[in-house]
Amino acid sequence: MTKDMTTGSSLKIILLFSIPVLLGNLFQQFYNMVDTIIVGRYLGEDALAAVGSTGCIMFLVLGFATGIAQGFGVMISHAFGAKDFRLLKHYVALSLILTVIVSAILTIPTVAASRLFLVWMHTPDNILSMADAYIKVIFAGIILTMLYNVSAGILRGIGDSKTPLYFLIFSSILNVVLDLLFIVVVKAGTAGAAYATIIAQGISAILCFIHMFRQFEILRTTKADYYLDRPGVINMLSIGIPMALNYSITAIGTMILQSAVNVFGSSVVASFTAASKVNNIATQTMPTLGTAMATYCGQNLGAGKYDRIFDGMRKGFFICIAAAAIGAAICIFGGEFIVSWFVSNPSDEIFSYAMMYLKTVSWFFLPLAMIFLYRNALQGLGEGLVPMLSGVIELVCRFVAIALLQKPLGYHGICLADPAAWVGAGIPLMITYIIWKNKKIRQHSSSPA
């Protein structure tokens, strides 16, 4: 069902919206976990390192696609908050048209150049072919990944965070079955794990769209809604492109980090891969909060309810504190246990490198949480430039940290790169929101009663 986030308790609305999103994010991690666990246990440590070494490149490309899709969802929330249902239907149709165009533009060059990307990142020779086999399949399925994210973004834009979860649960179960089929039975190697993922995502997307058009009359498009108009395309892309570039800029920084890790060999790559999975699990409340705040701020901006935006952001700050504390506890006290999920018979060396990373980054989870709060809120408010520039600052900080710390501190210096990037990116986001808030307060106080 739809949810109007422009009325009622802001804290309750944000939390209730966030719960299904959190579960969805966890199942999204479950996709990746299943791939990693089955690859590590049935194909070995080298195959695990191969899949892990593709993570940054995948984030670069799929992150761009995801950012575009999330931008479409923001415009949906604006139209829904303003109760302009004619525009809402056109935005739904336009989202589908632009999804097909963007996915076609992304798929062809990435499939063709995947091996070259891996070579540029200094992927070890012993895992290069396995990594390329995996990532080629993932890139070939970009349209399926985009369609799921667009369908979820549309539904979340109208306040429905439950429906995407239901189809994702089904798809996650299917992903497990397909992983075992392609890897254990068919013996398709690392490519089998990729086939399982994109097929499961594609089925989830198709089912989600079928249900969406049947269940929600306000989203049910007609032939008349499907057209490319300059204002509509500009509105959609003016939000979507900065969000997409922000993902990609962040991914470039992560690629620099992964490239630095690759220099230390496949054992360290496997350790870093497993530790990154733990980190992703521990911090899932943070992107969840960000998704909720983008929709909440977008709907209330469309309705012109600025006081509710201010109140929701105050509540969001305290949620950040709780999310950071919970994430740090998971990494510090449960890190070794979760690492063992991803590596068969992990050595002391694997545990040592993985925990060094987790213990280092967990102390900086509050700045990370605040990035998600302020970046997504600003994007929901239509302020896409500074969030994108904060990604550039994040990239620069990560690069400088690696350049300065890798030689004197070795792997530990690499571990400090993420915290440096989070602190550097968070400060301008917070300042920009404060400036935006004060501007709206002045405009409100100077307007006639």
Give residue ranges: language-model regions.
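Residue-level signal for short hydrophobic patches within transmembrane helices
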Residues: 7, 11-30, 34, 57, ...
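Helix-terminus/linker motif at the lipid-water interface of multi-pass membrane proteins
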Residues: 26, 30-48, 118-125, 181-188, ...
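Small-residue hotspots at the loop-to-helix junctions and early N-terminal turns
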Residues: 43-56, 131, 135, 194, ...
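Transmembrane helical elements of multi-pass membrane transporters/channels
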Residues: 16-35, 137, 148, 171, ...
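Short alpha-helical transmembrane segments in multi-pass integral membrane proteins
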Residues: 1-18, 76-141, 185-241, 297-364, ...
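Small-residue-rich hydrophobic transmembrane alpha-helices
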Residues: 48-108, 145-164, 271-335, 368-390
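Short runs within selected transmembrane alpha-helices of multi-pass transporters and secretion channels
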Residues: 69, 137-156, 164-172, 193-208, ...
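Transmembrane alpha-helix boundary and packing residues in multipass membrane permease domains
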Residues: 21, 25, 37, 74, ...
